[in-house]
């Protein structure tokens, strides 16, 4: 599972690119195709005005309560 927070939520908008020109959509599409659940912090998305914008297929809004539940159930958590 991947949970995007703060400014990282914009990565789930279509056609976002990094400094090298590689699309974030391509990376997220690969994760989704591999069965990875990709969620965005709903509060962070709304704070940045993107809560109602279309997201990359397979990405969805999630809650902090949902994140807390995932963390409690996980064997390992990696934070970047």
PLM-predicted stretches and their roles:
Residues 1, 18, 49-52:
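A broad "ordered helical/assembly scaffold" signature
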Residues 18-47:
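A glycine-rich helix N-cap at a beta->alpha junction
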Residues 1-6, 38-42:
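Short internal beta-strands
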Residues 48-80:
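C-terminal structural segments of small proteins and small subunits
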Residues 3, 8-22:
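N-terminal beta-loop-helix "entrance" segment that forms/cooperates
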């Amino acid at each position: 599972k991947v949970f995007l927070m703060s400014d990282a939520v914009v990565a789930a908008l279509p056609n976002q690119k990094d400094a090298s020109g590689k699309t974030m959509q391509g990376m997220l599409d690969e994760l989704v195709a591999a069965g990875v659940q990709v969620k965005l912090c709903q509060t962070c998305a709304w704070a940045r005005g993107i809560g109602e914008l279309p997201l990359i297929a397979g990405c969805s809004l999630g809650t902090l309560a949902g994140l807390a539940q995932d963390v409690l159930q996980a064997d390992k958590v990696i934070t970047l």
